[in-house]
Design a protein with these regions (language model features):
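Solvent-exposed alpha-helices and their adjacent loops that cap or buttress functional pockets
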Residues: 56-58, 87-89, 111-112, 129-133, ...
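Active-site/ligand-binding-proximal alpha/beta "capping" segment
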Residues: 142-194, 238-243
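C-terminal functional extensions of proteins
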Residues: 190-258
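Short gly/pro/ser/thr-enriched loop/turn and capping motifs at secondary-structure boundaries
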Residues: 124-130, 167, 195-198
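Structural motif
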Residues: 61-64, 94, 116-120, 136-138, ...
Length: 258
C-alpha cells in the first residue's frame, strides 16, 4: 500500500465534502453535535442544489459530453469532440461538461468556437482539476451527486467519449435511470467504436446472455465514430420531444436577464 497512488487511511490531508458526508461521525460533545452533524451538512447540500439550479435555470435541452481528463489535444478523439460540440453549438444546443481538461476541454472548446453556450460543472477533488479556458459559464461543486444531477437535469442527450472510471460511472448511471424508468429515454451515444467494442461485447455476450439485463437494454445506447451522426441523433431526438412553451419562455426570459 505504501506505493499506492490512492489515498490511504493515514492520509492527513483535509477531507473533501463527499468524504465528510460518507464518514461515520466520531463521538462529539453536545455543543459540537449540530454544527458538525450530518443534519447540518444536509443544509449545505440543499444550498448547493439551489445554487446549481439558479445558475442553470436558463439552460434547456443541452447535451452533456463526457470523457477522459487525460486525453491530449493531439488525440483523434479530442479533435472529434471539438467537432461534435461545434456542430451542436451551431445548432443552438448548449454543451455541458465536467469543466476540466481532456475531452471536457475539447467539448467546451468546440462549443465556444461554434458560438454556443459552453458550460463547465467542475468538482472539488483532493488533487487539483482546474477549469479549462473555454467556458462561458463555470460552476464548481463540492458534492459529486449534486453535480451529476445537473448533468442529467439540463441535458436531453449524453455523448460519451473514451474515458475511465468517472466516465463509466456517469454512463452507467444514465443507463440505469433510463432502464428503471426514472427518466424518459434520451440518447446515450458512445463515441469511438473501437474503444467501446470490448464493453459492448461484454454487455452482449456475458451480461445479456446470462440474463442480468434484458436484450432490449442493449438498445439504450448508440455507437458512432462520426461527429455529424452524433449531432444528428441528438437533433432527431429533440425534434420528437413535445415543446413546453412555458419552459421555453421562462428560459428565454432568464437568458435575457443575465
Amino acid at each position: 500500500m505504501t506505493n499506492s497512488p490512492y489515498r490511504h487511511v493515514s492520509d492527513n490531508k483535509l477531507p473533501t465534502e463527499d468524504e465528510q458526508l460518507l464518514e461515520s461521525p466520531p463521538p462529539q460533545r453536545p455543543e459540537q453535535i449540530f454544527l458538525k452533524s450530518d443534519s447540518w451538512r444536509v443544509l449545505r447540500i440543499m444550498g448547493e442544489f439551489v445554487w446549481g439550479f439558479d445558475n442553470l435555470a436558463d439552460v434547456s435541452d443541452g447535451v452533456t459530453i463526457f470523457g477522459s481528463a487525460r486525453t491530449q489535444s493531439i488525440d483523434p478523439h479530442y479533435v472529434k469532440a471539438v467537432q461534435t460540440a461545434m456542430l451542436l453549438a451551431q445548432a443552438g444546443i448548449p454543451v455541458i461538461t465536467g469543466g476540466g481538461p481532456g475531452i471536457m476541454e475539447a467539448a467546451n472548446r468546440g462549443a465556444k468556437e461554434g458560438g454556443g453556450l459552453s458550460i463547465g460543472c467542475n468538482i472539488e477533488l483532493p488533487f487539483e482539476q482546474g477549469s479549462n479556458p473555454y467556458l462561458s459559464r463555470s460552476l464548481n461543486f463540492k458534492f459529486f451527486f449534486v453535480r451529476k444531477t445537473m448533468f442529467v437535469k439540463y441535458a436531453t442527450a449524453f455523448i460519451v467519449f473514451p474515458g475511465g472510471y468517472g466516465t463509466l460511472d456517469e454512463l452507467f448511471e444514465a443507463l440505469t435511470l433510463i432502464q428503471t424508468g426514472k427518466v424518459k429515454h434520451f440518447p446515450v451515444i458512445l463515441f469511438g467504436s473501437a474503444y467501446w467494442a470490448g464493453l459492448v461485447e461484454w454487455l452482449t455476450r456475458t451480461v445479456a446472455e446470462e440474463r442480468k439485463i434484458n436484450p432490449t437494454d442493449l438498445l439504450l445506447f448508440r455507437v458512432t465514430d462520426d461527429p455529424a451522426e452524433a449531432a444528428r441523433i441528438v437533433m432527431e431526438a429533440r425534434a420528437e420531444k413535445p415543446e413546453d412553451p412555458v419552459a421555453r419562455m421562462t428560459a428565454e426570459h432568464l437568458r435575457s436577464a443575465r
